[in-house]
From Swiss-Prot:
GO BP annotations, alphabetical order: glycine betaine biosynthetic process from choline; negative regulation of DNA-templated transcription
Record organism: Chromohalobacter salexigens (strain ATCC BAA-138 / DSM 3043 / CIP 106854 / NCIMB 13768 / 1H11)
Summary of the function given for this chain in its UniProt record: Repressor involved in the biosynthesis of the osmoprotectant glycine betaine. It represses transcription of the choline transporter BetT and the genes of BetAB involved in the synthesis of glycine betaine.
NCBIfam families reported in the protein's UniProt record: betaine_BetI (TIGR03384), PRK00767.1 (NF001978)
UniProt cross-references to InterPro entries, sorted A to Z: BetI_C, DNA-bd_HTH_TetR-type_CS, Homeodomain-like_sf, HTH-type_TetR-like_transc_reg, HTH_TetR, Tet_transcr_reg_TetR-rel_C_sf, Tscrpt_rep_BetI
Protein name: HTH-type transcriptional regulator BetI 2
GO function terms (MF aspect): DNA-binding transcription factor activity; transcription cis-regulatory region binding
């Protein structure tokens, strides 16, 4: 009989094992048996908790997305400056949080992006994540520029964040998070300057 309270622990253990297996051999070769070996459990446990490999991959991506949301929220909550530029900066920082850029997390993200083109459940997760990033950026940009400009700025910065992340994740040495953050912040400042609202966006009590 399983111990009371073991399920959350076991689920986290299997999610970490999934990321480790994908990091080691890629998604296609990350079999249920290999994941189970990484976790030190029987393969039947995966079916018991997740219904199989697809369910486990979905749970793994939900965990990474939760980590991303938490990283952004923590940075925004800690802000002493309520300016749009500060909030957008926190969003940038959260997207390059260590939970998103380690080898296992990065390779799991890449596997997720590829699989989402063919698996509706993963495609929905990807859509929700994309919309959340765009909506959060757009809301802050709209505080200092017209709606049409804010939408364009949000699309541009979201693409910049995704592009920096993707290029970094595909390099043999891995993603340089510090460089990616610097480039994204630089692009943000260029956007604000282009739309003529750098000063307003940097001030919490602008009119």
């Amino acid at each position: 009989m399983p111990k009371v309270g073991m399920e959350p622990i076991r689920r986290q253990q299997l999610i970490k094992a999934t990321m480790a297996a994908i990091d080691e051999v890629g998604l296609a070769e990350a079999t249920v048996m290999r994941i189970a070996r990484h976790a030190g459990v029987s393969a039947g446990i995966i079916s018991h908790y997740f219904g199989g490999k697809d369910g486990l991959l979905e749970a793994t991506m939900r965990q990474i997305l939760t980590d991303l949301s938490d990283a952004v929220a923590a940075r925004r909550h800690a802000l002493e400056d309520d300016s749009p530029r500060a909030h957008i900066g926190a969003i940038i920082e959260g997207n390059f949080d260590r939970t998103q850029v380690t080898g296992p997390a990065a390779k799991t993200w890449l596997a997720f992006w590829a699989s989402s083109m063919h698996k509706p459940v993963l495609q929905r997760l990807q859509y929700v994540n994309d919309r959340r990033l765009y909506a959060n950026l757009c809301h802050q940009f709209q505080r200092v520029m017209p709606k049409a400009d804010a939408r364009n700025a949000a699309r541009g910065l979201a693409a910049m964040i995704d592009g920096l992340w993707l290029r970094g994740a595909l390099t043999p040495e891995g993603l340089d998070a510090a460089e990616a953050r610097y480039l994204a912040h630089t692009y943000l400042d260029q956007l604000l300057t282009h739309y003529g609202c750098y000063q307003d966006a940097s001030t919490a009590d602008f009119k």
